[in-house]
Amino acid sequence: MIRHSMTNTSNMNKEEAARLWNDNAEAWTVLARAGYDLYRDHLNTPGFFQILPEINGLYGLDIGCGEGYNTRLLAAKGADMDAIDVSEIFIQKAQEEEKAYPAGIRYRVADAQQLPFEAGQFDFATAFMSLMDVPEPETAIQEAFRVLKPGGFLQFSISHPCFSTPHRRNLRNAQGETYAIEVGGYFQNVNGEWVE
C-alpha cells in the first residue's frame, strides 16, 4: 500500500521527502512493474519520448529516477546514463534490475537539490514526474543546468495543477468507466480570491 501522498513537498525538508519516498518505494515498485502505473505507461512516458530530441550517443542524467523504468528506456535509445534518486530503496531496486539486465546505467542515491556531479558534464538531463516532489524545485532546476554542458537541455514533466484541486472527482458512466474528470476551484487564487 502506498502510504503517503507526495503531491506537496514544499513544506518539507529533503530528509522528510526522502523518508516518505522510502516508505513508498517497495509498494510503488511492485505496482508499477505489475502495470498499474497507467498514467506513466500510457500517457506521460509516451508523450515525453514523443518530444524528446535524439539522444543516441549522448551522456544523460535522470533526476528522480525512482526504480529506473524511464532511465532504462533512455539507455535503450542509446544514451549513456547516470541516474539519481533520494530514495535508497528505489536505487536498490534500480540496481537490482541493472544487475539482472545490464544496460550500463549508473544509479546512486543523491538529492536533486545538490547534485554530486561536476559542472558541465551532461549533454542532457531528464526528470519524469519528479520535480514537483522536490522541496525546492527551483534549486533542483538550477542544479540540473549547472551539470549540463553548454547547449545541453533539461526535459521534465510535472503534474498539472488541475489534478490536485480540492474538488476533484472522476465521473463514471453506468458501466463504472471513467469518462471525465470534474475539477473545482481551479481558477481560485491561493489567497482565496477569484480571478476576474
Tell me what each language-model feature is.
Residues 123-137:
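A short SAM/SAH-binding and catalytic strip from SAM-dependent methyltransferases
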Residues 59-114:
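Class I SAM-dependent methyltransferase SAM/SAH-binding core
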Residues 53-56, 135, 149:
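Short conserved AdoMet
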Residues 138-153:
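A short glycine-rich, Lys/Arg-flanked "PGG" loop and its adjoining helix->strand segment in the class I
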Residues 6-55, 69, 73, 90-93, 153-193, ...:
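Conserved class I S-adenosyl-L-methionine
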Residues 113-124:
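A short acidic, Gly/Pro-enriched loop at the edge of an enzyme's catalytic core
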